[in-house]
Amino acid sequence: MQQILTYFFLVVYSVTILGIILVIITENRNPLKTLPWIVVLVLAPVVGLVFYFFFGQNLSKQRIISRRTRKRITMQLEEPEHPEGPGIPPRYRPLASLLLNTLHSVPLYGSRIAVYTDGRSKMEALMEEIARARHHIHIQYYILNDDQTGCRLRDALVAKAREGVRVRILYDDVGSRGAKNSFFKGMRDAGIEVYAFLHVKFPLFTSKVNYRNHRKIVVIDGRIGFIGGMNIADRYVRGTQWGTWRDTHFRIEGSGAAGLQASFLSDWSATTKTHISGPEYYPPVGHFTDDILQIAPSGPFGKWRALLQADSYAIARARQRIWIQTPYYLPSEVLNTALQEAALAGIDVHLMLPARSDSKVVDLATHSYLDDMMKAGVKISFYKPGFLHSKLLIIDDMLSVIGSANMDFRSFEHNFEINAFVYDREFASRMAAIFEDDLTHCHTVTPGEWFPRPRTRRVAESLMRVFSPLL
């Protein structure tokens, strides 16, 4: 009897492994991704099964919100000129079309944009706008802590809810796991609608833990929006133990807020299974500037990796400069190659990273990519006063990209992210000035400094690079 059970479990086990291998093959992934999974499943089946369950499943064909619902929400945006019409510079019209076709990200005209480079100024601006709210406040953060900063926000929202303002909050269930349940319950008791995005009951027993909502947006009365890299926690305002927290966030007034509204309402519909609509959520707004922007929300569910495709497309067509700020650099092969080719072609490619991030493992993996970058002529600068958490891309003298997405596998493949693509010469000049000011606080490394690193350090970097897609 025992022998029969042994054979039975062996057959079931083998069929399971073969079935997963067949699924991986028929997903038609990049062979560089397919082959390692097959090797791990064959050589270490138990470990392979566990890792595949958490990190390997391809959810691109699944949807958390139907196309019909998404279209119904985005159709509430005021339909502007087609991106091939006047306004967007001819060089960037294909990029605008790419974002339109992959994300239904329509060009939005005439927004006024304020830029914040520290958490204190961003928080003060946010609190001022909350105090002015009259109809609704929509808030979405990856991290919503119950520390002093989080409690300050909570108290302001509770006060507005008591005034009759409709307050809705989405937070990521994994990113905000440090906050006590009582923190959210107190807001619900005050009449605020609070939901966790992709709720995870048992983090150790679900593959959903690998797919998180990394967006950081606020929309107030459909007229004012915030987007960028800052969450709600004390460290974004006060800094870290080893220095300041340097980040970038936008306050958008005008039509750009409608793009943030559409993203929030899509996530709200996916989370609560309720659809919110009405002209009060997309009020008429004036045109304040000549800025043209596209709000680009991307995620793991769907055919396209739109932010990766858009960044790669823009980088490959740069003519003068490509300036990047990112806390983590764990790029895809396509993006990494595009940057090296640009540098080899004589384009000014400059990558700014934190001298120290919040993860030593990620630092090691990031550094493994820098040798080839420097050999190609890419300038590498390390920000020294604290943690550089800013996510910024400047292409030539026209395109600026800011938002929640890092230059890493997780942002491009697994997370729900949102970036703003701004087409404007004057605005690009403003962002370049910020980049240049940050450079005064950086150390730009030379090949003579970088290449003689100890062999043990290089081995550690290479080892961590193997795990880049999981970090």
Please provide the spans of the model-predicted regions.
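Helical hairpin unit composed of two closely spaced alpha helices linked by a short loop
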Residues: A318-Q320, Y328-H350, P354-A355, S359-V361
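Thr-Gly-centered strand-to-loop micro-motif
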Residues: I324-T326, Y383, I402-G403
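A beta-strand-loop signature enriched in Asp, Gly, Thr, and Trp
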Residues: A345, V349-I395
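Short, solvent-exposed amphipathic alpha-helical segments in soluble enzyme
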Residues: A338-A342, S368, D437
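N-terminal localization/anchoring segments of enzymes in phospholipid and broader phosphate metabolism
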Residues: M1-Q309, Y313, R317, S357, ...
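Histidine/acidic-residue-rich catalytic or RNA/ligand-binding cores of hydrolases
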Residues: E333-N336, D363-A365, I395, E413
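A general structural signal for well-ordered alpha-helical packing
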Residues: L308, I315, N336, V349, ...
